[in-house]
Amino acid sequence: ALLHHVPDIINVPRAGIVHRLDKDTTGLMVVAKTIQAQTQLVTQLQSRSVSRIYECIVIGVVTAGGKINAPIGRHGQQRQRMAVMEGGKQAVSHYRVLERFRSHTHVRVKLETGRTHQIRVHMAHINYPLVGDPAYGGRFRIPPAASVTMVESLKNFPRQALHARFLELDHPTTGKRMSWESPLPDDFVWLLSLLKQDREAFIG
């Protein structure tokens, strides 16, 4: 798709991609059109001057925000997965609560580092795995006496409930600070609306 819109990036390593999103994660990502821009943007990522903020829906009621500083490496047996482990690469995430529901929480996460599956691994590590993410413990949880629609929506949510919401960086040529925000996708908004309806029906 990138090559269709910007054919010249075939000459840039990794088709200009500066950082990746996990499969099925929606939202913003950085792509450079030249090698020079890619090099500069990678440097910004490594120096942690790029601001990347995500939103997710997790299983469980998160009591407060916080910081997760837990190293991440490749899982010893299941090589497609990552895990918190001694000897892994440093990984730091900052999270805060946006909204609480009966059995779930809408959370915002700011990345300080950018390890593979970082948010998914870190939130599971503190026992709040993402909705729709069975690879990291996100088996669906049903609020007591929830509606059939609520149950089916949680059970069949087709992906991890994770969205790259906000991105801020310095333009690689001009140095101007730039930012972008991506609206939440329809499936995410729909699930939030169901969770709100469920909370209001039982708590008011």
Which residues does each PLM region occupy?
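Conserved hydrophobic positions within beta-strands
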Residues: 58, 94-97, 130
